[in-house]
């Protein structure tokens, strides 16, 4: 079974024995070498190119690139640019989370929700794109932002995002998805080991110094995770089924992001460190890190003696979560997933809630057939 998202795929091969996942192999088949197209260009070209190359979270990619370029020059965003960047990051995070939940959920929505969900998603997309386009043009104003944020909030509410907490509103698409997993006890609960700003120094140093780190990142003695579940304080609650906790974390993340976006429009003041940060790196370099829908995204650059980009590195959130020895594999391994289509259904739910940025393919086989 294949779920389409974007370029490349993640292969998930699971061997089951007596209905338990006894072996899990995850292999990414993604286009490599994309960062080579940045090398040799002027640093100021990187943000625009990053936003064009990546179809998902393009604004987050652009902001991470911009932060890295500024950090390499020992510069920072001014207040106006920071306002636009924060607004755009929040808007994109809200829409991308909603889009992935509604469109990628493996169980079809009940007919009474499906048509309305599509309409509300289109409204959310239009509001998000309005905020992002104003940010790109440097024309973010608080009144304009407030109007777009209200429109985005209305669409999210219609899809089930609550005003408080993480329980979806009744008779909505998100409530239907929660019903699909609220009694699913296939996967045991696990507390996430969040990737945070405190890890940036080590991550960026390894990204710069270790070949292949961008595709197989690691932190010694840890199984680091990034994204809504890792960001959520409620992720440690043990009583709810694991899939329901992951879903609630994403619903809660959208609610929090909407609250932050509304406050930003009202006051113009926001602690950007919770969304994005940057710093210099050796060799006339810099990095930018942003918290996007799927987790923490890194861009790291080096500028050569000719003033052009001499090196460019990107580390995406999916590489942490779907690492061959990462949190997705740890959660899946030894779980009673069943066999055949039942196993595919359970694994696909888990994969969607880990939210990869590319398609995934699931293959399940019995140990006797391996």
From Swiss-Prot:
Disulfide bridges in this chain: none
A GO term for molecular function: nickel cation binding
Pfam families: NiFeSe_Hases (PF00374)
InterPro entries: Ni-dep_hyd_lsu, NiFe-Hase_large, NiFe/NiFeSe_hydrgnase_LSU
Top-level taxon of origin: Bacteria
Classification via SUPFAM superfamilies: HydB/Nqo4-like
Family (UniProt): Belongs to the HupK family.
Protein name: Hydrogenase expression/formation protein HupK
Native organism: Rhizobium leguminosarum bv. viciae
């Amino acid at each position: 079974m294949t779920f389409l998202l974007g370029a490349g795929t993640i292969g998930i091969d699971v061997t089951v024995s007596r209905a338990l996942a006894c072996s899990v192999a995850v292999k990414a088949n993604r286009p490599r070498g994309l960062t080579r197209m940045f090398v040799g260009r002027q640093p100021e070209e990187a943000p625009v190119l990053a936003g064009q190359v990546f179809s998902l979270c393009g604004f987050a990619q652009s902001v991470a690139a911009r932060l890295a370029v500024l950090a390499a020059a020992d510069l920072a965003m001014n207040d106006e640019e920071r306002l636009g960047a924060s607004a755009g990051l929040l808007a994109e995070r809200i829409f991308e989370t909603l889009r992935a939940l509604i469109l990628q959920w493996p169980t079809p929505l009940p007919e009474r929700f499906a048509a309305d969900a599509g309409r509300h998603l289109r409204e959310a997309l239009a509001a998000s794109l309005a905020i992002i386009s104003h940010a790109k043009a440097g024309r973010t104003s608080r009144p304009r932002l407030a109007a777009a944020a209200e429109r985005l909030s209305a669409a999210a509410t219609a899809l089930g995002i609550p005003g408080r907490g993480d329980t979806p509103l009744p008779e909505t698409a998100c409530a239907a998805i929660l019903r699909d997993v609220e009694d699913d006890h296939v996967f045991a609960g696990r507390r996430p080991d969040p990737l945070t700003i405190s890890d940036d120094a080590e991550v960026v140093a390894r990204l710069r110094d270790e070949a292949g780190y961008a595709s197989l990142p690691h932190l010694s003695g840890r199984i680091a995770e990034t994204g809504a579940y890792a960001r959520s304080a409620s992720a440690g609650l043990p009583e709810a089924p694991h899939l329901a906790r992951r879903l609630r974390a994403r619903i809660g993340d959208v609610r929090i992001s909407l609250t932050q976006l509304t406050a930003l429009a009202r006051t113009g003041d926001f602690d950007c460190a919770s969304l994005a940060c940057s710093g210099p790196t050796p060799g006339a370099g810099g990095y930018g890190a942003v918290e996007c829908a799927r987790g923490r995204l890194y861009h790291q650059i080096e500028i050569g003696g000719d003033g052009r980009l001499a090196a460019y590195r990107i580390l995406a959130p999916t590489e942490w979560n779907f690492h061959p020895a990462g949190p997705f594999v740890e959660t899946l391994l030894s779980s009673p997933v069943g066999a055949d289509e039942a196993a595919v259904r359970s694994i696909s739910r888990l994969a969607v809630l880990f939210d990869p940025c590319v398609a995934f393919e699931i293959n399940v086989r019995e140990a006797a057939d391996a």
